[in-house]
Regions:
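Short hydrophobic/aromatic beta-strand micro-patches
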Residues: 43-45
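Catalytic core of pol beta-like nucleotidyltransferases
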Residues: 1-22, 31-36, 47-107
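Short, conserved active-site loops that position catalytic residues or coordinate cofactors/metal ions
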Residues: 38-40
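Conserved H-loop
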Residues: 28
Length: 107
């Protein structure tokens, strides 16, 4: 199992390196009961010109020090708005039921 401290540390590393708009925890650690086989699911909202798969790879490189099994989805604010506008049920569930573990100050 992945501790809450480890999840917070991962979010802090991502935030310190990439300054995302928001990091949302979803999946079993956010809305279920994680077990020993559960991975960490993160939805990261940030500006980027890279392709989505490369964005996730960039985050994995930042987190290379400690291995935690995880799935990382990275979308730009524009991509997120588009997915919401077309009614993407998966994105809606993440936004509705996920836990925001980092939000950049807008000030």
């Amino acid at each position: 199992m992945i501790s809450r401290k480890t999840i917070t540390d991962i979010a802090r590393k991502i935030a310190d390196s990439l300054n995302p708009e928001k990091i949302i925890l979803f999946g079993s650690y956010a809305w279920g009961k994680p077990d020993k086989d559960s991975d960490l699911d993160l939805f990261v909202i940030m500006e980027s010109t890279e392709r989505p798969i490369k964005r996730a790879a960039s985050i994995r490189r930042i987190l290379k020090d400690g291995y935690v099994p995880m799935d990382i989805l990275v979308r730009t604010p524009e991509e997120l708005r588009h997915r919401i506008n077309i009614g993407d049920p998966f994105i809606k569930k993440i936004l509705r039921d996920g836990q925001v573990i980092y939000a950049r100050d807008s000030a």
